[in-house]
């Protein structure tokens, strides 16, 4: 298996191998801000991860210690595995957080969005506060999307038995984002500040606001 010389979990290695071996599928994920690279890239990042992490987040203590990068986005941010299970994001502007409960749900989310950027279109409290708002945002994004990878992603979804149901995708997203304890970095240098959540550059306030909105919707 490719990526066999990396420290990534086997299920993550299997997805990376499938994607990197299929040019169309790799391009499709690239369009969604999930840039998959070869084993040498992963291995090099593993060897230099401490410095890479500090370059992105500054000096600090992470709430999760077992962090392994498996992809980048277009800004240079990292998609990572936390504790060999959770999927996290480490941004370039001081933000980080958990985005999915596992690699299967993460891959399902990306494939179901079909070329729509998860990061730029859906990570905000208003969009995620209800199923209806999320589905409206999805429909608007699909209309504006210039890249059509529907056929490629449909094949990927069918192969893995993933869902296309947007209500289920919404559930995957909000349950992933609201996993606790939060993935955050507490600054250990006075010249830096604590990390923000992926929902906004204000510490964890936006994430807590989302949790409150979801609880209110259930009452």
Write out the residue ranges for each language-model feature.
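A surface-exposed partner-binding patch
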Residues: 1-92, 141, 145-219
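Hydrophobic alpha-helical interaction segments
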Residues: 125-141, 159
């Amino acid at each position: 298996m490719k990526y066999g010389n990396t420290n990534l979990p086997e299920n993550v290695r299997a997805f990376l191998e499938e994607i990197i071996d299929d040019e169309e599928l790799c391009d499709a994920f690239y369009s969604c801000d999930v840039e998959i690279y070869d084993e040498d890239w992963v291995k090099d990042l593993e060897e230099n991860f401490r410095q890479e992490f500090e370059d992105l987040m500054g000096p600090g203590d992470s709430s999760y210690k077992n962090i392994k990068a498996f992809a980048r986005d277009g800004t240079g941010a990292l998609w990572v595995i936390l504790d060999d299970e959770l999927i996290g994001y480490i941004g370039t502007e001081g933000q980080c957080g958990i985005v999915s409960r596992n690699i299967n749900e993460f891959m399902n989310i990306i494939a179901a969005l079909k070329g729509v950027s998860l990061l730029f279109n859906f990570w905000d409290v208003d969009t995620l506060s209800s199923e209806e708002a999320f589905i409206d945002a999805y429909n608007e994004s699909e209309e504006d999307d210039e890249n059509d990878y529907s056929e490629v992603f449909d094949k990927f979804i069918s192969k893995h038995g993933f869902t296309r149901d947007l209500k289920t995708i919404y559930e995957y997203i909000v349950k992933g984002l609201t996993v606790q304890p939060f993935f955050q970095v507490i600054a250990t240098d006075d010249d830096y500040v604590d990390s923000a959540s992926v929902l906004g550059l204000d510490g964890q306030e936006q994430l807590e606001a989302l949790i409150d909105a979801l609880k209110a919707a259930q009452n």
